[in-house]
């Protein structure tokens, strides 16, 4: 039923804090974005979609959320990311 899907699968246990959350993708898509342990911190970065989501380390700085998709490798500091090819940038497999 809709209630079962909401609370168990997509809510706090399934999609949120347990499965999609803390260890794998971060404390749900709301709290800490996509990341925390799995998607975020080391690989993809820091505050973006939620709090520790897509940006900083590999993909960049202020763009989508807070420090999101852009700057360093992929984008800008204005709004939507745009592709910037940066040679010698191992984060995006740049030329060497």
Swiss-Prot record:
The N-terminus is blocked. Sequence repeats lie at residues 11-15, 16-20, 21-25, 30-34, 35-39, 50-54, 55-59, 65-69, 70-74. Its main location: secreted. GO terms for cellular component: extracellular region. Keywords: Biomineralization, Chitin-binding, Repeat, Secreted. One of its GO terms (biological process) is biomineral tissue development. The keyword Metal-binding does not apply. It is found in: Secreted. GO terms for molecular function: chitin binding. Expressed in the gastroliths. It comes from the Eukaryota. Residues 75-96 are annotated as: Disordered. The keyword Zinc-finger does not apply. Residues 11-74 are annotated as: 9 X 5 AA tandem repeat of G-S-X-X-F. Coiled coil: none annotated. Associates with chitin and plays a role in calcification. The gastrolith is a unique 'organ' that absorbs the calcium in the outer shell, allowing the shell to soften and break when it is necessary to shed it. The crayfish then re-absorbs the calcium from the 'gastrolith' and the shell becomes hard again. This is Gastrolith matrix protein. It comes from Procambarus clarkii.
């Amino acid at each position: 039923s809709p209630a079962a899907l909401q609370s168990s699968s997509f809510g706090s246990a399934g999609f949120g804090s347990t499965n999609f959350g803390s260890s794998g993708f971060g404390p749900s898509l709301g709290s800490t974005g996509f990341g925390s342990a799995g998607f975020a911190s080391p690989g993809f970065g820091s505050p973006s979609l939620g709090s520790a989501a897509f940006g900083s380390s590999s993909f960049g700085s202020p763009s989508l959320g807070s420090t999101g998709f852009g700057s360093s490798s992929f984008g800008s500091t204005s709004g939507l990311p745009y592709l910037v090819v940066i040679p010698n940038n191992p984060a995006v497999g740049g030329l060497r």
